[in-house]
Amino acid sequence: VMSTEMGAPISWARSAQAWAGQVHIEATIKAAEEMVWEYSRGTTRIIYEGIGVCSLITPWNWPMNQIACKVAPALVAGCTMVLKPSEIAPLSGTLFAQVCHDAGVPPGVFNLVHGLGPEVGARMSVHPEVDMVSFTGSTRAGTQIAAAAAPTAKRVAQEMGGKSPNIILPTANIAEAVAAGVNAVMANTGQSCDAPTRMLVPRNRQAQALKVAKEVAEAIKVGDPREVATVMGPLV
């Protein structure tokens, strides 16, 4: 499903995309089992409780992982929620809704809505009965969501996109470092928030770095994401 909707090569989708979502759910369960939800501190009683209704807006590049990261903690905390997956990659959200139904999540606790960000996402951010918005996506959309949520003093949690450079120091093994960087940026077809799309190298090692980067890039298998040997599939 994830490979079909956003182009991740099937080998990567199976080993990383599906794995990451499962791991986050397992980690949430473990944290909930270890957490002390109510305790005394001196004469004060500390009680942790769900914040209320949550709007969850997820991106297309890690569809199931991002859904798991947001839905699992909300369920554990006892919140109700509305999930809007990216309109570009809606299949994982639909599948997750079926899983919740089959697992016996009570009606009204988990709700799924599809639609465009500027329309549905905007309404989810501004609605007066929503207590919290959790958003992962672009900086442009994130700033709009924060502004929309401000008048009703909603809590807003955001991870807004940006990519980081490789910083290769003079003492590094240039060939190994450059090869690792190029392979990392191609993972998930280059469509990850942490894809290192820039590389900073000492000026006197630039020619060597370019040579290695070219060799590694040319060896990467580009093709149909349904083929297990494919490393670089189609881009959204």
Where do the PLM segments sit?
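An alpha-helix initiation/capping motif
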Residues: 15-19, 23, 118, 230, ...
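ALDH superfamily catalytic-core signature
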Residues: 132, 140-236
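Long amphipathic alpha-helix in the N-terminal Rossmann-like dinucleotide-binding domain
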Residues: 7-35
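Short, structured beta/alpha segment
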Residues: 1-4, 175
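Rossmann-like NAD(P) dinucleotide-binding subdomain of oxidoreductase/dehydrogenase enzymes
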Residues: 37-176, 207
